[in-house]
Every structure is written in C-alpha cells, then in structure tokens.
Amino acid sequence: MDLFGKKVLVIGMGKSGISSARFLKKHGAYVVAFDEKREDEMKTQQKETIRKFADELYFNDLPDAVVDTSDMVVISPGVPLTKRYITLAHKRGIEVIGEIELAYRFCRSKNIVAITGTNGKTTTTTLVGEILKKVFDNVIVCGNIGFPFIDYVESSTDDTIFVIEISSFQLETIKYFKPMVGCILNITPDHLNRHMNMDNYIRAKMRIFENIDQEGYSVLNMDNSITRDLIGCAKGTVITFSKNESDTQNSVFVDGDFIYRNFLGKVEKVMRKDDIFMPGEHNLENTLAAIGCVLPFEIQPSIIEKTLKEFKGVEHRIEFVREINGVRFYNDSKGTNTDASSKALNSFEVPIILIAGGYDKGESFEKFAKLISQKVKKVFLLGQTKQKIADQLQKIGYLNFEFVEDLKEAVKKSFEIAKEGDVVLLSPACASWDMFESYEQRGRLFKQYVNEL
C-alpha cells in the first residue's frame, strides 16, 4: 500500500488518531486531522503533538469539501459510523478504515492473537501476553489496551507475535485484518447507545472471525449463550473453553478441581483451578480463554501454570488499593457495564459498600439492582445514571443508597460508615465519560482519594 502523496483524513485525535497521523506523515501522506472538540477544549500539549504530523487541522466542524478531496479516511474507535462526514465519505466511494486495519496492512508478522468480548478483554490479553513472553522473545501486547497497534508495526519482524485487544468499535472498520487466533470471550449488552441494538453489537464482535482461514483458529466461550450460538460462524480450527467438563476436541475445560486442555487429540492436566492467583469466577473464565488462545503455540503446561500462579491481574479490575482499620478498598473502574460490575460484586463474600454510576450507555439496571440488594450494605451513586439506578433500587424496595456530587465525596462517605471487615468497591457499571476522560483517570483518582484518607 503506497501512501506517498495521498491525502488522508484522520478523524478523532485520541491515542490511535495521533499514532495514525504520525505513521501516515512518516510514509509521505498529506495528513488532514479533525477532532469534534472545540480548539479551546483540547489540551495545549495534545494540539502541539497533532500539529507535528498534520498538514491541515480542523476542530469542531469539518467542511464537506475536505472529505470530498480525501483519498482515504482513517477514523478513531470513538467515532460513530453514522456521523455525517463518514456517511459522506462512503457515498463518495472513499475508503474508510480504522487504525487496526491501517496497521495490519503494514504488518510483516502474521502471528496475531486478537481478543474481543464485552468483559475480560484487558485481563485476558495481558495474560496471553505474559504466557507467550515466557517462551518467545518478541511478543507485543497492544490495541485497545492503551497502546496502538500502529506504533509497533514498523519495528516488527516476521517472528513478532502480536497480542491485540480489540473493541467492537475497532472491529467495525476492519477490511482485510486477519488474526491467526481470534477470540470472543463473551457477549452481554453493552454500547447499545452506539450499536443501537444487540444484533448490531453481536455482528460487530463476530467480525473478528471474518478473514480467518483454514490455518487459523477461532476461540469461543461455551458458557455464554450468545457466543455458544456463534460456533457455526467461527472459521478455521475452533477452540472452545468452559468451566464445565467437556469431551470436545480442541478445548479447555474444568473437571473437578483441575483445568485440562484437549488439543490435537491429546488431553493434558494444566493446573489446579484454585492455584490461579486472581480471585473470582470471571477470572477463571479469563484464564480458560487465555489457555485456549495459546493452544496453537503448544506451550508446556508447567509454564502456563507458573504464569497463572504469579499473574496478579491488571490495573482498574478489582485492583486492591489499600486496607485501613480492617476496611479494604478495591478499584474496579473498568467495570463499565452491569455484567462486569456484577462479577465484581460476586467476587466478595463480605459486606460491600459500593460506589456506582456514570455515563449512560443505554443499559438496563434491573438485574444489577437486584444483585445490589443481595450483596451491598450501602451504595453511593454519582454521575449521569445515578437517578436511573436509584429508580430501579426503589422499585424493589432497596433504599440504602445516597447521591453524591463527585468521587471524592463518595470515598469520604464510604470510609465514614465502613466497619472492620467491609469492602469499599468502586465498580460503576457505567462508562466514565460524563465526569472523567477515561476509566483509567476515574480509577487513579479513586486510588488517590483512598490514599489521602
């Protein structure tokens, strides 16, 4: 693919947008950058970085003429395909792709493990990377995890193994992207404000299998009703994982106290499930998925076992922060939907003080409210969805909730009522964009406020 002299419009100036602009400029493209923010809303340092790589820069509104004269459009994951300028580009026959697709077209290595799903993506992606790094020298973990794929393609070789976390938004804009291993961890309602309905969301996730050939592998969760039904759409060799016993070839499963793998007709014991360092049933699921993703690499069970005994999880996912007077504080800012936060609540058998609420993605809180009533002694609600969650709690007669203005107030009040043995858990069940730049910022502020107590 020759970019020299091509006019490429890059839409969205977050991490992947800036990385795409940098790459395109280096390869001789004429780069036009656009972000919907007003110029005064963008940080000075960010603007200065963009100007290094952009020949033209637009804020807030994009003239149709700019789209009309572009040879290609590269969009960031946060940009909906329904935007006027995207629709116009399609109408004009201009190719619209994302950073993942752009990176793939310049990637020399075909050793790509791509992982998607509603929940568990970051933990599983990181874990797969840790297992592979025990055996292979050149393993790169990137993607939606916070490190754009495009930043690493030029330094890669034929032997590089990429482990890429991919969101449904990123999968919407692939065309030729073909992983060696594609995995869907689970699918539950999420991002319905963007995808409009579950069918569209499922179709976006399924695209991870779209270009896999006979030499590739599709990894699926048999314990999730939606992903189980996708087995007929999976391509290449299908690998399944389940917390239940299985006699299926090419599978990872639990039998009694042990995790087993069945690959190429050979059944092997991997480890005791209770030896996994990370707590919670959801992390058992993430572990099984990770073992499934590395099956094609034929790694010794002892190496996998050692990694899983040592792996402590990822930041913002049921992350232990501090214990004060017998009260433990956990940061689960990555709980951005009710399924993820439900799993966090179910990870504890002690009284929980919950901090929840945030940006409204259109999800129902009915089931989540019932679980709160069973597991939570008090919940502090904040953000755009606080009234929506409160309404569901009131419907079932649960009144132990309180509205707070911000996260600092929530932490302070939680500590004031907590008793020895309690857990204070930030698990919002919502995205962060109403009050914070990202779930990472929300989680780090939570940790800051806890450490200031």
UniProtKB/Swiss-Prot annotation:
Keywords tagged on the record: ATP-binding, Cell cycle, Cell division, Cell shape, Cell wall biogenesis/degradation, Cytoplasm, Ligase, Nucleotide-binding, Peptidoglycan synthesis
Class of enzymatic activity (EC top level): ligase
Annotated Gene Ontology cellular component terms: cytoplasm
Origin superkingdom: Bacteria
The keyword Cell inner membrane is annotated on this UniProt entry: no
Catalytic activity: UDP-N-acetyl-alpha-D-muramoyl-L-alanine + D-glutamate + ATP = UDP-N-acetyl-alpha-D-muramoyl-L-alanyl-D-glutamate + ADP + phosphate + H(+)
GO biological process: cell division; cell wall organization; peptidoglycan biosynthetic process; regulation of cell shape
Pfam families documented for this protein: Mur_ligase_C, Mur_ligase_M, MurD-like_N
Subcellular location: Cytoplasm
Main location: cytoplasm
Any one GO molecular function term: ATP binding
Pathway(s) per entry: Cell wall biogenesis; peptidoglycan biosynthesis
Binding-site residues for ATP, renumbered to this chain: G117, T118, N119, G120, K121, T122, T123
EC assignment: 6.3.2.9
Gene3D superfamilies linked to this entry: Mur ligase, C-terminal domain, Mur-like, catalytic domain, NAD(P)-binding Rossmann-like Domain
Cited InterPro entries: Mur-like_cat_sf, Mur_ligase_C, Mur_ligase_C_dom_sf, Mur_ligase_cen, MurD
Family listed: Belongs to the MurCDEF family.
NCBIfam families given in the database record: murD (TIGR01087)
Role summary: Cell wall formation. Catalyzes the addition of glutamate to the nucleotide precursor UDP-N-acetylmuramoyl-L-alanine (UMA).
HAMAP family, per the entry: MurD
Listed name of the protein: UDP-N-acetylmuramoylalanine--D-glutamate ligase
